[in-house]
């Protein structure tokens, strides 16, 4: 199957290139047009139906007209001269709020409308909420409907913001905006320029790495071009699959997929390029098309194994209960499978067309490069494996020490969001009112005895909630039209996005609800703090299930690939150390050094899957090469030295490219994105340079042939291959010879 695909691609390269060009452009355009219809920004929507906050959301939708795609924001209106609001000012604020509610906000504007652009035009829901006790400001609630991550929806909010500012400024009033869309848009604006610069820098770094390694402009540009085409097709396939299957993606998934595809796609092209150059060097009489066919057939199996390892790792997310995790698995799997098909077709086709011109103007096809760091590293690992093992474990252990005292952060604070105008407005509100006034915790009561609800019937529950330590205020009870449901808004003194508010809701508030629930009723607690309190429970449950299932599945794959019981154990232990070190380092940086409330709740699972899957890829490459070298005559340690010498350049280059790709996320606008980017980049670097180039070969040198127990490699007869003497180290190859099957 693999050789059939690569064979056709190298026999008919122009057909394959044309097909991918059309397919990539079409699917990329489709994905960009529909991506925001396939994403769900509400984290609560990903909770299983049996969680308390999810039940509260259903009551809010059924009895109080709440909409799942509604985006509430808060507008602060105050006098521009800093004086307290007068009664006339309050009347004017309320009158302008009514006018804003009647005035439609148009987006896109008629002059800016593009074909297939989605119309976000709507009338906002604007209502007065409360005046500060010192009359320093009055708050309005604003509700706009749509996906807050959609640029069109963000432009709609910007248009409303300008309308509101202009309307109140005419009367000498200033405005501030916070919560919901205000937070999202301000954070996006704060990080927009930086994200663009970082993206450009990432591409430049990848290009420079390729130029330095291959001394060729084509070898630098063509991989990026190929990966961009395949990545566009993959993104469109993911969005299309999500829409057809009726599942919602998390807004961060498309961005994460793009980074993953750039990283692994260039990695796969690198594996082909290294072997292609080696093939052309060793057989100068062979045509470029024939060399491409031979290389793609051999390396294609290694690429397939690497891709299927990632797919298998992320497929374990199917057992997760939290929907954000459960949909991430299929999305990554579909994207990686598309990249795999492209790696077996488009990439070999490009090699076949480019031939020896791929490495112009480099003289690398004629001159053998001098052995450098890789050869010295291989010799050092072979001569002093115990020292290398101790040093590697000490480094990983020191980083893993950061796990002590690590906490999970289930909020949405941090990053640029804490330095925006929305954050400043929230701080101003919190100085005069409970922090939860703009994002209350809702207690929803439904009658189950066939009767109706009254404020008097719920008076005991409201009093109990008022008495809870940490509750700043309890709003009057609101009844549904048919009086079968009621809502009691609770305003915590802590920011609903903070751990204190989540602890309050999951503990004292729910305890008070359970103890004072009126007979014949059912009570659920909802709101931001309640949602993230429930997410914490779901994530804790999923981590206990997904971790062992993923580890077992990857171990099974290694058993099949390496044909050994001991080698997979060695590789998985090393990868486990790498994961612990990476997560510990992330806690040291974000929680302890930067003072964040903890590491993002998605980080351990996403990091585990990426570090284990991608780290296993590199370990497969070095492990397979060690086995190949041990089949030759000579000492086991000499075989390890040769394996490191030949494979380290490919692993190092691939690791740097992948780390640069993920590292671009580390300076993104969101705290969660920053943490995933930093941690994954660090984990990949540790996997490449500490695990695959140092620790695993050193362990293999210590264990010798017994590492392949119970099926040691069949050693060829003949004299031992001598290790290169120092004076001779100028004629050996540094190429990674990936042996497969």
Where are these regions (language model features)?
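Membrane-embedded transmembrane helical bundles of large multi-pass transporters/channels
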Residues: 1-40, 125, 145-408, 518-520, ...
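Short, conserved active-site loops that position catalytic residues or coordinate cofactors/metal ions
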Residues: 36-40, 71-77
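Short hinge/gating elements
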Residues: 41-44, 412-413
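Structured non-transmembrane domains adjacent to transmembrane bundles in polytopic membrane proteins
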Residues: 49-71, 80-181, 405-592, 596-598, ...
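N-terminal extramembrane/targeting module of integral membrane proteins
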Residues: 75, 79-82, 383, 397, ...
């Amino acid at each position: 199957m693999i050789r059939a695909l690569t064979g056709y691609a190298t026999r008919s390269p122009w057909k394959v290139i044309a097909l991918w060009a059309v397919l990539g452009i079409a699917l990329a355009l489709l994905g960009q047009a529909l991506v925001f219809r396939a994403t769900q920004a509400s984290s609560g929507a990903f909770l299983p139906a049996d969680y308390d906050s999810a039940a509260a959301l259903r009551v809010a939708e059924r009895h109080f007209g709440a909409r799942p795609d509604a985006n509430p924001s808060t507008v602060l209106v105050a006098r521009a001269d800093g004086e307290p609001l007068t009664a006339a000012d309050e009347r004017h604020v309320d009158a302008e709020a009514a006018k804003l509610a009647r005035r439609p906000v148009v987006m896109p504007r008629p002059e800016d409308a593009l074909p297939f652009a989605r119309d976000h035009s709507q009338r906002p829901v604007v209502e007065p909420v409360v005046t500060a006790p010192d009359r320093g400001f009055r708050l309005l609630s604003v509700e706009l409907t749509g996906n807050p991550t959609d640029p069109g929806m963000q432009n709609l909010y910007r248009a409303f913001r300008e309308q509101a500012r202009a309307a109140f400024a005419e009367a000498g009033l200033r405005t501030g905006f916070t919560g919901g869309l205000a937070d999202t848009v301000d954070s996006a604006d704060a990080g927009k320029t930086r994200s663009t610069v970082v993206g450009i820098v990432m591409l430049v770094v990848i290009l420079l790495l390729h130029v330095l390694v291959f001394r060729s402009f084509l070898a630098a540009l063509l991989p990026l071009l190929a990966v961009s085409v395949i990545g566009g097709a993959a993104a469109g396939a993911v969005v299309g699959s999500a829409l057809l299957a009726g599942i919602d993606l998390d807004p961060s998934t498309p961005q994460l997929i793009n980074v993953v595809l750039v990283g692994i796609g260039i990695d796969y092209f690198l594996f082909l390029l290294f072997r292609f150059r080696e093939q052309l060097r060793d057989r100068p009489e062979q045509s470029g098309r024939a060399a491409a066919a031979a290389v793609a057939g051999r390396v294609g199996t290694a690429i397939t194994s690497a891709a299927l390892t990632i797919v298998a790792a992320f497929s374990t997310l199917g057992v997760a209960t939290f929907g954000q995790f459960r949909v991430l698995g299929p999305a990554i799997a579909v994207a990686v499978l598309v990249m795999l098909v492209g790696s077996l077709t488009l990439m070999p086709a490009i090699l076949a067309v480019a031939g020896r011109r791929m490495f112009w103007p480099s003289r690398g096809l004629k001159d053998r490069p001098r052995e450098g760091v890789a050869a010295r590293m291989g010799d050092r690992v072979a001569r002093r494996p115990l020292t290398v093992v101790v040093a590697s474990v000490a480094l990983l252990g020191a980083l893993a020490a950061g796990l002590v005292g690590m906490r999970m952060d289930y909020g949405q604070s941090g990053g640029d969001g804490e330095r925006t105008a929305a954050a400043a407005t929230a701080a101003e509100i919190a100085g005069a009112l409970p922090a939860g006034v703009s994002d209350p915790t809702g207690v929803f009561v439904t009658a189950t005895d066939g009767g109706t609800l009254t404020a008097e019937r719920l008076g005991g529950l409201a009093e109990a909630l008022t008495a809870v330590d940490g509750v700043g205020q309890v709003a009057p009870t609101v009844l549904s039209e048919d009086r079968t449901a009621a809502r009691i808004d609770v305003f915590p003194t802590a920011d609903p996005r903070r751990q204190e508010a989540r602890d309050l809701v999951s503990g004292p508030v729910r305890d008070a609800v359970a103890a004072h629930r009126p007979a014949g009723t059912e009570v659920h607690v909802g709101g931001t703090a309640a949602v993230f309190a429930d997410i914490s429970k779901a994530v804790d449950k999923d981590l206990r299930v997904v971790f062992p299932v993923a580890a077992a599945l990857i171990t099974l794959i290694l058993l099949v690939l390496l044909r050994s019981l001991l080698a997979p154990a060695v590789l998985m232990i090393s990868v486990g150390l790498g994961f612990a070190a990476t997560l510990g380092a992330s806690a040291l940086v974000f929680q302890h050094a930067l003072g964040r409330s903890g590491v993002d709740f998605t980080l351990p699972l996403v990091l585990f899957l990426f570090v284990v899957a991608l780290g296993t890829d590199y370990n497969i490459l070095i492990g397979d090469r060690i086995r190949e070298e041990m089949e030759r005559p000579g000492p086991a340690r000499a075989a390890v030295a040769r394996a490191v010498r030949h494979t380290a350049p490919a692993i190092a280059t691939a690791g740097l490219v992948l780390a640069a790709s993920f590292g671009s996320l580390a300076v993104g606008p969101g705290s969660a994105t920053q943490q995933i980017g930093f941690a994954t980049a660090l984990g990949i670097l540790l996997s490449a340079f500490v695990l695959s180039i140092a620790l695993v070969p050193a362990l293999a040198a210590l264990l010798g042939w017994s590492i392949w127990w119970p099926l040691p490699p069949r050693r060829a007869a003949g004299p031992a291959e001598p290790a290169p003497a120092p004076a001779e180290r100028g004629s050996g190859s540094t190429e990674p010879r990936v042996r497969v099957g």
